[in-house]
Amino acid sequence: MSTVLVRRKERRQPPQMPRGEILLESPPELPEVVTNSFQNVLMYLPMAAGSAAMVFTFLNHRNTLQLVAGGMFALSMFGMMFGQLSQQSGERKTKLNSARRDYLRYLGQVRQRVRKAAKQQREALEWNNPAPGRLWSMVMSPRLWERRSSDADFAQVRIGAGPQRLAVQLIPPETKPVEDLEPMSAGALRRFLRAHSTVPDLPVAISLRSFARILPDGDPKAVYGMVRALIMQLAAFHSPDDVRITVCASRERMPQWQWMKWLPHSLHPTEYDAAGQVRLLTHSLVELESMLGPEIKDRGMFGASRAPAEPFHLVIVDGGQASYDSQIASDGIDGVCVIDLTGSVAETNEATMLRLRVTPERVYVVKRDRAGKEVLSSVGRPDQASIAEAEALARQLAPFRTSAADEPEEDVLSANMTLTSLLHIDNPYNLDPAVLWRPRPQRNRLRVPIGLDADGRPLELDIKESAQGGMGPHGLCIGATGSGKSELLRTLVLALAMTHSPEVLNFVLVDFKGGATFLGMEGLRHVSAIITNLEEELPLVDRMYDALHGEMVRRQEHLRHSGNYASLRDYEKARMEGAPLPPMPTLFIVLDEFSELLSAKPDFAELFVMIGRLGRSLGVHLLLASQRLEEGKLRGLDTHLSYRIGLRTFSAMESRVVLGVPDAYELPPSPGNGYLKFATEPLVRFKAAYVSGPVDEEPQTRSEGPQIVRQVLPYLTDYIRPQVVEQPQPEQRAEENKSSESLFDVVVRQLAGHGPEPHQIWLPPLDVPPTLDELLPPLSPSAAHGYTADGWEWRGRLHAVVGLVDRPFDQRRDPYWLDLSGGAGHVGVAGGPQTGKSTMLRTLITSLALLHTPQEVQFYCLDFGGGTLAGLAELPHVGSVATRLDADRIRRTVAEVSALLEQREQEFTERGIDSMATYRRLRATGEYAGDGFGDVFLVVDNWLTLRQDYEALEDSITQLAARGLGYGIHVVLSSNKWSEFRTSIRDLLGTKLELRLGDPYESEVDRKKAANVPENRPGRGLTRDGYHFLTALPRIDGDTSAETLTEGIATTVKTIREAWHGPTAPPVRMLPNVLPAAQLPSAAESGTRIPIGIDEDSLSPVYLDFNTDPHFLVFGDTECGKSNLLRLITAGIIERYTPQQARLIFIDYSRSLLDVATTEHQIGYAASSTAASSLVRDIKGAMEARLPPPDLTPEQLRSRSWWTGAELFLVVDDYEMVATSDNPLRPLAELLPQARDIGLHLIIARSMGGAGRALYEPIIQRIKEMASPGLVMSGNKDEGILLGNVKPHKLPQGRGYFVERRSGTRLIQTAYRES
């Protein structure tokens, strides 16, 4: 049998017994009779004398008329005398009647006072000693077991009802002798005193503590009925801890007492048998004494102690074996009263005995006079209770037990009560959810105890709407720090979880500050969401707004689509009637620290109002909790908050805002004390239950040695021996201190995992990035397509997944798919530093690589973001990855893609290909082999760096973006902010991925939402639609750790590479470090043009055409390849011209060109200034002879027919050594402008040192002014711009910038010619 713990409250004050006295007034007295005859005679004598004289006067005349007149005079005289006497008598009677009336009226007023006092006296006595028929109602009231051993009326029991003196003393007046009193008034006084001095049928009680033995006799039925009534009152008002009621009866009479086995007062406190606690009903006093043991063994004689022993024992002896050496059969035991129904116990001390004679109508107290004769004193009518009535009361009391924390002298609200005690759960370690979650009556639905009220009764919070008998669906809880608010919320949520299944009730638990209020509840299947730590992550508040708003909409749509139900109540009613509808649990939202939430996000109040308005019908209940509540915070919401809980507040004003009174401010400081207010009911004071305290150690289900076998047995009074079996040695339990676990932890662990999974209202925030294998269809190797999602419909269609999109309103997270097949084919990624831009690019590349073959997509990467893209270089889809310092590869990459664009523009036109979609289709079907490329992606990580360091490439990439999309050329760019892209290219980026920006104001999605993208969360960003997303990790091993990302990418690249056996992405062709001269076009292929190398853009030959541009300049550091270039040019001249066509003169102070010309082409070689001057004079003379005369025709100028001879090539090496103050070449300066006409060519190579100043040297200045081609090789950038707009910088040997007026500036690699 389950038990119910009773925490006894402070005893209520009974009705007051009237006190005092009433002094009655004396009745009126009879008036005294006045006997003044002589005075009356004297008063009437003159009248009589006069009348007699008149009579005698008329009689003397003996006339008849006169005789009549005399008689009339005599008659009138006697009439006057009689009238006077009558008048005096009437006045006396009138006064006496008035006095009588006044006295009777006075007695009537006193009678009202006396009757009121009698009523109060009856109420007071019946409060303390109710009739047996009313005791059943006391069991379910706060008065159960209200009397404590320290109370004056402890162990006082009613035995019947009889007359008693009026509590207000009626004091009769002192009067004259009765014969002097007005008879009627005196009689009324006597009757008044006789009627009201006693009050009939008042409860008659005896104190069991005052007697060692009570011996009732008389009519057996009446005796048993009275004793049963006596026991019933004793059991109803006294707890089992204070009173024991035991029976010693013969077997024949034991059936009279079988009902007492249900009384908790008749159960042994520590001994158990097979049926439970041993029943204290025996057949002998010796056996009873052995069962009671020390409780009575060590007690003294009756009355020896001034403080009675506890607990008090009432022993009923009805036959049985009463041994004379029994302690109970002695003269009396302290704190023990024996009711002997059969005289089985020897009579000893008459002074401590009470004899009663009981008849069906009267009960008498029996005493003996000195002669030993019985003297009977009636006390009233005996109480009677049948066995059925007694057993009914006993069964009511059977489950109740006193709480161990009961402190009679203390306020019931001062102790802690566990939730399991309120729910009548004995062992929290052995919970059965199937039993706990059994269907509950509608009255108990959403109704749970949360603590004890001031009367010690469980206080239940009912969050149903008032129309269903509840307190309302929405409430408010305010409590200062240390008031126990968090504990109350935990208690409420845990109580609801223990009594309602997840099919009936779900929770959304929100803690704005991120405290531990709801910590540990994640395992409950009731919990749809636990949201904490919003204070530090305010963007999550908006996410919660969307989630809760979405849940309201979802419920509305579900009710409408399921059958257009008006409310959840109608929906559940249809389910119960058999409609095939899924469960739709009630949702209870508990929000702690809501006041601070509203301070941070005032707009959230609109959602609260919406829930308050629609939640009743949708089954969404709301409890708002906070430490403080400012006036005005609840504006618009307070009308929806039907119940309010006020724990101890910081101020009286806060208490008034919540409860309307300042009482919550005056609560004691101990946690859990509070007030509950709902509807128009008065405030209810309560103490919340405690669930965070340690729970008793889990009871051992198996132990070493004998174990009692559980059986189903009849519940009898006799001892039932348990069936014992031997148990094997138990396994050694792990050393675990169960007492360190809290009740909360134990219950949550017991309930975790039971019930259906709840609907997820709040998905976890985007904190843990997914991996690509989690977002893509199943991946596997394919012979035709490599490692991919083979067979998936979107494979190979330029779709890529790059992350997860958070849709809190829809309560789901979707893969973030990009469609790059159409106008959104260019991608821009913007985000502040360390926001995950490079990872986004890697994810995009990897995702496309997993869904396309290397023949379908190719990637060419410019990595200015720290080298992270280098990890993808081994992908078969990646043609090149160039880092910031790899300038050659960067330029070549852009040049290659640009060349591909130009090639496709030409091919598409020639072959009639109208779009890239057609091109893809033709390649896929094999109708067109193509150019070896598919969709080509030029990826630039950190666009600003490219603009700053490679400004010339910006225009090229802009052109690629403007023209390339229609030809399968895509650009993917990243930057720190959108403003770093010029408008010309930013508008072309059809797919924009916006990560966290340094300044949300620059967002191109939504500035307000951009501010909510969390900081220090790489990969978080906004979609075009304003949804938050999280970038996926570019790996396929399921590992979300950032620490192992490099290894994960390497594994992914290796997996993709090993699964592909076809051609890979064409690599970027680079300028060779060494270009053999033999690879240049021959004279037959190039004519008179002299090839000196190949350019970077197209890797095509670069020529010097001296017919067009007669001069050539070379600037370069030592050992950069200047002399090699001069040898190469010289060899080209010799190869293309005969000695008759061209002659060579060398000025070479360092003698590096001694062996260059071994043919007849060389006509001069100067290694010194003197030799050079001599040669220059000769050259000048020869050239001046070729100057055109003034009369030449245009045709002659074009054909140069006015002179004959060879072209003269003057080759100068180390010009810085030549161009001194006595420059031997200076005389030629005036001939340079006409050099083309006269066949003079200067080829000058100069060191880079001082080249900036050398530009103003006359010969170089004149050549530069003529826009002659030149080559700037490796040098120091401090020299400034030398040719065109080229500043020198470090370059490999043989490499330089070829500056020409027609083709602009090109980077070329000059050919190497072996000496």
UniProtKB/Swiss-Prot annotation:
This is ESX secretion system protein EccC. Pfam families: FtsK_SpoIIIE. The active site is at 593. PANTHER family: SPORULATION PROTEIN RELATED, TYPE VII SECRETION SYSTEM PROTEIN ESSC. Residues 62-64 are extracellular. Its main location: membrane. Residues 1-40, 86-1315 are cytoplasmic. GO terms for cellular component: plasma membrane. ATP 3 binds at residues 1119-1124, 1293, 1310-1311. Keywords: ATP-binding, Cell membrane, Membrane, Nucleotide-binding, Repeat, Transmembrane, Transmembrane helix, Transport. Residues 456-656, 813-1004, 1099-1282 form the FtsK domain.
